[in-house]
Amino acid sequence: MLKLCFRSLLCLALFAAVAQTPAQAAEATETRPPEWAQPVEKDYNLYQMSPTLYRSSLPDGGALPLLMKLKIGTVITFLPESDARWLSTPGVERVQLPYRTNHVDDSDILRALRAVQEAEAKGPVLMHCKHGSDRTGLVAAMYRVVVQGWSKEDALNEMTEGGFGDSHHFKDGVRYVMQADVDKLRTALANGDCSTSVFALCSLKSWVNSTATIPRLDPQAALPQR
């Protein structure tokens, strides 16, 4: 009799432990550091990173009422396709900065960060790609590190564990973040440089354009008059 009671209690205890596991897992999933981007709308993978910056997957016309409610003034896409297909709202600026995480360099990140900062000066900003995970996730992580001063570790934790998408999407972005020279990026961003390297294509183009605009002296005009 005692053995039977003991076995029954043991079974009940095991059942209770198993029954609590999903609830505990759900609670752990819902526990989110307050400094991480906070969910706004799951259907669009829409999160708020700061009072003036949001991130999402590719929106559509159905998202417009929500974007208007959030007072979004600029939408930045990292896709090669224009947002004009779904966004033509007067007063909302469209910015297109296509890039790929497997071919990203410092000039791509600086261009994106600069666009975000310039747009934030005018009001709330939404940045997005197709799924809102890899391209958007990389820019978000670099914004955290370069602009907001987060550590790489903290930014990568948010990128990979924040619930923005499948982890296999992040490998190229993680590689870039780990190798990025944050001090050089921060200096280039502050100075208005297009890249951290003077040998980057955009830097060479800028140098060629600057030399082309230098006024040339007329050798005859330089001669002393008699």
Question: Where is each model-derived feature located?
Answer:
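Short cysteine clusters
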Residues: 129
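Conserved lysine of the Walker
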Residues: 135
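Bacterial N-terminal signal peptides that target proteins for export
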Residues: 1-10
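Cys-dependent protein tyrosine phosphatase-like superfamily
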Residues: 14-125, 138-226
